[in-house]
Amino acid sequence: MIRAGIVGGTGYTGVELLRLLLPHPEVELVAITSRAEAGQRVDEHFPNLRGHCNLSYTAPDPAILGTLDVVFFATPHGVAMDSAPKLLAEGVRIIDLGADFRLPDAEVFAQWYGMAHRAPEVLGEACYGLPEYYRTKISEARLIANPGCYPTAVILGLAPLLAEGLLQEDTLIADCKSGVSGAGRSAKVGLILPETADSVSAYGVGGHRHRPEIEAVLSDISGTPLELQFTPHLMPMIRGIHATLYGRLAQPMSDAALQDLFATRYASEPFVDVLPFGSHPATRSVRGANMCLIAVHQPRPGQVVVLSVIDNLVKGAAGQAIQNMNRLFSLAEDAGLMQIALLP
């Protein structure tokens, strides 16, 4: 059994990790930490876990964490970097669901996150945890940077075209919508029901932290530096990300050729489902599942629109982290992740 721990177990991502790890056939969950809730039972905070989790929160203890096989950090940026070097030295594998290791350049990280990177000595070995494109590297890694939720949806939607040089790099637009859970569990006036219900609003239009992450990974996949316009929106729903992705083709392609490109690229991927050409995937179809639904459109010759939807807490966070763990420990990639999406 894989001995696992979670640092930061009171947020939505942390409890989603709990929900998925507790029934995992190859995992023993040993520790879940929270300084604020230390000593309190986990199921007192999350009644959906009653009868499934007997653990209590503890303060982070390096002596305990250092004995584990893998530690998940479901923490804000700036936390994992302080613990990573010591845990790695003790042979612990790390999966960081925060942003500390997603950007390979420490200066770029400082620019977007407003703090100096405090573990530059291990930043260079972090592997970006998108299994559909970095599967082999993930299997050999010690430190996994779990992708952000928006980047997961955008990269999976655009990468097949960019990997083949089929899009004009200066025409890329990502218009994305997210549920409120993507903003975390902390109390914020702008996220309470009277502020979000019956309303849609854009944010981060001048520059969102996920943009450099998306650009870095797509540049790596395409083999050429590229930029895109990324605009996120907050939607009056709890879960889900819907990415509408635009680009102009570098050469003419038929609808059938576009569909075949995506269908072939993702044919063997257990968690990417390419729908029939011209389909309209909905976020409600992936709620609670580690799945990305993709549909391709060509509304006029040369103009491509890709629709990509995920559950931000599962394929956009906890589910993908477990997918990465499965790769790290040579398990079936879909182990513990075959939940069917909830409907309605």
From Swiss-Prot:
CDD domains tied to this protein: AGPR_1_C (cd23934), AGPR_1_N (cd17895)
Gene: argC
Protein name (Swiss-Prot/TrEMBL): N-acetyl-gamma-glutamyl-phosphate reductase
Pfam families: Semialdhyde_dh, Semialdhyde_dhC_1
Reaction catalysed by this enzyme: N-acetyl-L-glutamate 5-semialdehyde + phosphate + NADP(+) = N-acetyl-L-glutamyl 5-phosphate + NADPH + H(+)
First-tier enzyme category under EC: oxidoreductase
HAMAP family: ArgC_type1
Any GO MF annotation of the entry: NAD binding
GO cellular component: cytoplasm
Biological process according to GO: L-arginine biosynthetic process
Keyword list, A-Z: Amino-acid biosynthesis, Arginine biosynthesis, Cytoplasm, NADP, Oxidoreductase
Source organism of the structure: Acidithiobacillus ferrooxidans (strain ATCC 23270 / DSM 14882 / CIP 104768 / NCIMB 8455) (Ferrobacillus ferrooxidans (strain ATCC 23270))
Pathway: Amino-acid biosynthesis; L-arginine biosynthesis; N(2)-acetyl-L-ornithine from L-glutamate: step 3/4
Biological classification of the source: Bacteria, Pseudomonadati, Pseudomonadota, Acidithiobacillia, Acidithiobacillales
InterPro entries linked to this entry: AGPR_AS (IPR023013), AGPR_type-1 (IPR000706), NAD(P)-bd_dom_sf (IPR036291), NAGSA_dehydrogenase (IPR050085), Semialdehyde_DH_NAD-bd (IPR000534)
SMART domains assigned: Semialdhyde_dh
EC number annotated for this UniProt entry: 1.2.1.38
Function: Catalyzes the NADPH-dependent reduction of N-acetyl-5-glutamyl phosphate to yield N-acetyl-L-glutamate 5-semialdehyde.
Subcellular location: Cytoplasm
Catalytic residue positions: C149
Stored PROSITE patterns: ARGC
Family of the protein in this entry: Belongs to the NAGSA dehydrogenase family. Type 1 subfamily.
